[in-house]
Regions:
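Gly/Trp-centered helix-boundary motif
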Residues: 1-196, 200, 330, 341-356, ...
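Alpha-helical transmembrane segments of integral membrane proteins
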Residues: 166-383
Length: 383
């Protein structure tokens, strides 16, 4: 009985909240901006779905049940011999041919993605020369005229539709838009995060130490910022082969500068505050003062810029791809699709698709950025 009484009178253990009271108020301010809050969820949903683009748009089935065994062509390569026996000779199966589809229907089943085209799949059964209009704009006879058996061909079905048409190389526009969305957001996120790390570190060093350190770095940044980025890209593109990481590295050389000024100003303002002098008097090292005491306050201004920097990074990649200075030819690129729309004005579905994807993506990021700015506004947090 005494043990039960002791346990009953024992005070509950304190559990530290996940967010501090200040950050809880900021989160409530962010949620109060309904447009920005729901824009964040919509953007995250679209981004997470795009990470699984191979399961949404692919010229391979997701799963195949064939003669009592299950296979995952979306992940693994299988030879044609597995499905066609001695009649198969290709080391990697082309799942769009009629014989493969007939083998699946006779000996099992195949689970296909919603879009049966990858970003690089060429559709050879178009009703007219590429770029062709969305399939739902044609009659059944027009859609099936390029197939061997016409309207009776099993390949002429709803699953092989090009819902948003094809580009000038007979590739599915919807598939390229899905993959292009993913690569644009990934490029922007990586570039923004790396730029923030470098820019915040440089700005913190300048603002905290001041003196000659600040003076020399400021002169270097002034010279570095005056370099013509476009001409440097032209020169490097002529020397090095185009690639995702090469382009990211080139852009990173110049993007980090945008973070330095804000962080530097915050450190210059706060480095002589009383709590910083008290930490020095207690023997706290410079690194601990920078990262534990000054950086959290300086990051408030930096975080409000991140959605807009991400927005600018995506726009920059699209612009470079539009000019032919971005990703390698054939990559899933919104800028390359936009250039095709400019060169094929008779195919308005190309430009309209890119316009809708870009305007939606950039608008969502702007709404999120406005909500983040309101969340960190001291007048709303402490008012």
């Amino acid at each position: 009985m005494e043990t039960v009484a002791v346990k009953a009178n024992k005070p509950a253990e304190y559990k530290r909240p996940f967010l501090s009271p200040l950050n809880q108020r900021r989160w409530q301010n962010f949620k109060a901006n309904r447009r920005g809050y729901w824009s964040l969820w919509v953007f995250l949903t679209l981004f997470v779905l795009s990470l699984f683009a191979e399961f949404l748009a692919n010229d391979r089935p997701i799963l195949v049940w064939f003669k009592g065994s299950i296979h995952a062509p979306v992940i693994f390569d299988y030879p044609e011999e597995l499905w066609l026996g001695e009649d198969g000779f290709l080391p990697v199966t082309d799942y769009k041919i009629t014989e493969i589809e007939q083998a699946f229907s006779q000996h099992g089943w195949a689970l296909w993605p919603p879009v049966r085209y990858s970003y690089r799949t060429v559709n050879n059964e178009l009703p007219e020369p590429a770029p062709s209009a969305p399939s739902w704009l044609y009659s059944k006879e027009q859609r099936c005229q390029a197939y061997t058996l016409g309207v009776d061909d099993p390949g002429c079905n709803l699953g092989n539709w090009n819902w948003l048409g094809t580009d000038d190389q007979a590739r599915d526009v919807l598939a390229r838009a899905i993959y292009g969305f993913r690569i644009s957001v990934l490029f922007g996120l990586i570039l923004t995060l790396l730029s923030a790390v470098i820019g915040v570190t440089a700005g913190a060093g300048q603002g905290y130490f001041g003196g000659w350190t600040d003076l020399l770095f400021q002169r270097f940044i002034e010279i570095w910022s005056s370099l013509p980025v476009l001409y440097i890209l032209l020169i490097i593109a002529a020397i090095l082969p185009p690639g995702f990481w090469i382009l990211l590295g080139i852009m990173l050389l110049f993007t980090w500068v945008g973070f330095v000024g804000v962080v530097r100003a915050e450190f210059l303002r706060a480095r002589n505050f009383e709590y910083v002098n008290a930490a020095r008097a207690l023997g706290v090292g410079n690194r601990a003062i920078i990262y534990r005491h000054l950086l959290p306050n300086a990051m408030v201004a930096t975080l409000t810029f991140l959605p807009f920097i991400l927005n600018g990074s995506i726009t920059t990649l699209t612009s470079l791809d539009f000019l032919g200075l971005g990703l390698p030819p054939g990559s899933a690129s919104l800028g390359e699709l936009l250039a095709q729309g400019k060169n094929n004005l008779q195919a308005p579905w190309l430009g309209i698709t890119v316009f809708v994807v870009l305007s939606m993506m950039l608008s969502l990021l702007i709404f999120v950025g406005e909500a983040v700015r309101d969340a960190f506004d001291p007048r709303k947090t402490f008012g």
